Regions:
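S-adenosyl-L-methionine
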Residues: 201-214
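Core catalytic lobe of class I
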Residues: 1-195
Length: 214
């Protein structure tokens, strides 16, 4: 059911994307699929297979390095000091980057990068992005601004529209506001909608007051 939902959502996104549109999807490498017994699945691979089936073209995978990781499950319960069934836990996530038909942008626009911030560009193209875990528990799955900010800088013009079909607490929208991008956020939960709207409005209000002050 989950995979059918993912295919339905990203099929609709594929339909409305321009031929040179990009998709950047933050996802765990692996997740549990059994409540017990150590069963895990390579989620990133399964999601990519769905995207490829839809028609997306693969570009790259960015490894996300959490600089302040939460405590991981390091014990191998049920096989302590034994190779019978050790539980190896990989908490890492990635960003799968793909495009519709054309990787090099046909449409022209204004880049975030220039000579003054070229070191930032070089850091991002290395393929490993550092991020700090989000400590504010706004929703069940809110994430750090350190993830959408570099993705938007790297893969969009300032004139582009950024779409987030799982808007949640509005982190992508907030990142777009910080970078001067237009954005669209889709969220079914009214509670999450309210959280996102308040969060972004508060940021915009602060920025406006700063401009008025100076």
């Amino acid at each position: 059911e989950y995979y059918e939902f993912i295919e339905d959502v990203f099929s609709k996104i594929y339909y409305i994307m321009p031929d040179d549109g990009r998709l950047a999807l933050n996802i765990p490498y692996e997740v549990n699929y059994k409540k017990s017994g150590g069963g895990r699945t390579f989620l990133a691979s399964k999601i990519w297979n769905i995207l490829e089936k839809i028609g997306y073209q693969y570009s790259t995978t960015i490894d996300l390095n959490e600089t302040s990781p939460h405590k991981s499950k390091l014990t191998a319960w049920g096989s302590w000091l034994s190779p019978s069934a050790p539980y190896v836990y990989n908490p890492k996530e990635c960003v799968i980057v793909c495009y519709k038909k054309v990787w090099k942008r046909i449409t022209k626009g204004t880049s975030y990068f220039n000579e003054s911030n070229k070191k930032e560009f070089i850091k991002y193209v290395a393929g490993v992005w550092d991020y700090r875990a989000e400590t504010q528990k706004l929703t069940e799955a809110n994430y750090s601004l350190d993830i959408p900010l570099p993705a938007i800088k790297m893969f969009s013009w300032k004139e582009d529209i950024v779409l987030d079909p799982f808007f949640g607490s509005g982190t992508t929208g907030l990142a777009c506001e910080m970078l001067g991008r237009r954005w669209i956020g889709i969220e079914l939960s009214e509670n999450y909608q309210n959280i996102a709207v308040k969060r972004i409005k508060d940021y915009v209000k602060i920025q406006r007051s700063k401009k008025e002050f100076f």
